[in-house]
Amino acid sequence: MMFSFFKSPIVSLTPCKTISIPDVYRYISGPYAQNRTRNLRSLADPQKAAEYKRSKFDYVTFSGVFQKRTDADLVAHSRLLCIDFDHLDNLQEVRRILLADTYFETLLLFVSPSGNGLKWVIGIDLQQASHEQWFQAVSNYLKFTYQLDADPACRNVSRACFLPHDPECYIAPRLLPELKQVLQTNPEVEELMNNLAATNIIVEQLNNESI
């Protein structure tokens, strides 16, 4: 489940390295995008906010490794699909719903750079269906089951996902061993692991309340 990481701005189409979900968790939970996320959310003008995000935020292509960020330059699919939910009035409720869903395992879940949306990363089996078919199937499932609308732009395999700061970012428990390896060489290990433990406790409490 490896994919490409790109440095800002968005017009930079050549990736600088290949990373994994635990790497993204470390980035989002750590201080790397904290200031720019705060600055973005302070901008009242939507056009200025969009320009700031496109010029200042690093990003990934969750669905694969690329030579360049175009569908034609896909080197290897990651077997991951990232679904965007924009302009949510009930963000915390949607977060709880996604984490409690038993059909799709949530591998990573975090608040979007704007602060009013969510990014949901799940695994897909390309032997069963293509990337676009999976996107359509998942979108239909979300709409029918939860009345949630997925951003249609996510059907593109080269879809860029900006990386914000979210100290409550969720990562699947089965990825914790790999995450610990990623964190071992970094000074912020203790703080990140404490944040992770607190987040998992909150998720467990929310799931218990929904039963």
Features from the language model and the residues they span:
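DNA replication initiation modules
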Residues: 4-12, 67-89, 124-211
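Signature for HUH/AEP ssDNA processing cores
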Residues: 1-116, 124-137, 201
